[in-house]
């Protein structure tokens, strides 16, 4: 299959609107009133509307509360933060590499916003940890991914998929790398998100959970971007719209769900009150189905039709317009005058 060519800095012979997502022609001048995809500009506006920084969230209450968590809750908290930090670090790099081959300036611009948001997510984990634990513990948490065997297996599954594209950039490997991206942003975070939301509904670590919700909100838009690109590529490269691709998506999502369930059993299992292991595993399958539908593919678990963890919907519904479900003043946080709000300790 043809190799992908990186986007030119500019091309005076091409129109502003691109002729293709990959290996197309475009001037590379971005005019939002002259772009190929009608969904690109509304998505750009939504991504900008989500703008936030960790500094807006006061961590002083969480800092007081963290030592009162059970040992199991503290251990899960730290390991899940360590996982999220790894995933968002990798995601920042992958999105920038993928953007180099996008020959549509509007999609490249969206990818730039996405990459920036991933940097903010990653920094938010440092912000949380610096509020709660000593520097030495923080450093240890950021090394978990190197030494934890369960975590390594889970991470290597994603990285292997990304590296196939990086080492051999073709339309096929690019398309397949999107599936791994959707898994990373749209599946691998979700048992971890559920842990923090479960703490929040028990009035524990509310500020951290609010930050997680902001990240959740961003990731939903990131998944929307990548699934749209995936479906557009199947139109642009009909030779990739095959049974082989459908099988690849299904088997890859199922393998990812199995690894996610293994991680959940290892890190949470039946050790955290309020999280039912059977419900969580069904929930992971439910989310895998949701991502398959967004990719325009068949559900890998057709027998799973409903979300068994109905309580979590309030935490994931980031556009409901309801008052802050964490019972904080509002989601428009006043700026904290001292780092992490420690002037209030």
Swiss-Prot record:
Please give the cofactor(s) recorded in the UniProt entry for this protein. Answer: Fe cation
Q: Which molecular function GO terms apply here?
A: metal ion binding; ribonucleoside-diphosphate reductase activity, thioredoxin disulfide as acceptor
Q: Where is the active site?
A: 125
Q: Which Pfam families match?
A: Ribonuc_red_sm (PF00268)
EC numbers, comma separated = 1.17.4.1
Q: What is this protein called?
A: Ribonucleoside-diphosphate reductase subunit beta
Assembly and oligomerization:
Tetramer of two alpha and two beta subunits.
Q: Name the species this protein comes from.
A: Halalkalibacterium halodurans (strain ATCC BAA-125 / DSM 18197 / FERM 7344 / JCM 9153 / C-125)
**InterPro entries assigned:** Ferritin-like_SF, RNR-like, RNR_small, RNR_small_fam
- Please tell me whether the keyword Plastid is annotated for this protein: no
Q: Where does Fe cation 1 bind?
A: 88, 118, 121
Query: What exactly does this protein do?
Result: Provides the precursors necessary for DNA synthesis. Catalyzes the biosynthesis of deoxyribonucleotides from the corresponding ribonucleotides.
Which key words tag this protein in UniProt? Deoxyribonucleotide synthesis, Iron, Metal-binding, Oxidoreductase
Q: Which GO terms describe its biological process?
A: deoxyribonucleotide biosynthetic process
Recorded name of the encoding gene: nrdB
Q: Would you say which domain of life the source belongs to?
A: Bacteria
């Amino acid at each position: 299959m043809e190799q992908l060519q990186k986007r030119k800095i500019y091309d005076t012979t091409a129109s502003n609107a691109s002729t293709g997502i990959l290996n197309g022609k475009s001037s590379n001048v971005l005019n939002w009133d002259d772009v190929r995809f009608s969904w690109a500009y509304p998505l750009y506006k939504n991504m900008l509307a989500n703008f936030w920084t960790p500094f807006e969230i006061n961590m002083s209450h969480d800092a007081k509360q963290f030592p009162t968590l059970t040992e199991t809750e503290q251990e899960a908290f730290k390991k899940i933060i360590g996982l999220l930090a790894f995933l968002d670090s990798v995601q920042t790099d992958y999105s920038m590499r993928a953007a180099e081959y996008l020959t549509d300036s509007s999609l490249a611009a969206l990818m730039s916003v996405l990459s920036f948001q991933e940097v903010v997510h990653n920094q938010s984990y440092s912000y949380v940890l610096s509020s709660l634990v000593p520097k030495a513990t923080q450093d240890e948490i950021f090394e978990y991914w190197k030494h934890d065997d369960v975590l390594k297996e889970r991470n290597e599954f994603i990285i292997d998929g990304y590296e196939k594209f990086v080492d051999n950039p073709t339309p096929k490997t690019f398309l397949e790398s999107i599936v791994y991206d959707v898994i990373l942003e749209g599946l691998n975070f979700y048992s971890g998100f559920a842990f923090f939301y479960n703490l929040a509904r028990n009035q524990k670590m509310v500020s951290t959970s609010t930050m997680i919700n902001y990240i959740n909100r961003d990731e939903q838009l990131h998944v929307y971007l990548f699934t749209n690109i995936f479906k557009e590529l199947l139109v642009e490269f009909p030779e990739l719209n095959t049974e082989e691709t459908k099988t690849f998506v299904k088997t890859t999502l199922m393998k990812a769900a199995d690894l996610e369930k293994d991680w959940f059993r290892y890190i949470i299992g039946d050790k955290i009150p309020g999280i039912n292991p059977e419900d969580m595993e069904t929930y992971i399958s439910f989310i895998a189905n949701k991502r398959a539908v967004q990719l325009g593919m068949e559900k890998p678990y057709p027998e799973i039709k409903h979300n068994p963890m109905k309580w979590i919907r309030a935490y994931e519904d980031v556009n409901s317009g309801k008052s802050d479900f964490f019972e904080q003043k509002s989601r428009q946080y006043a700026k904290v005058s001292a780092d992490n709000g420690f002037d209030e300790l």
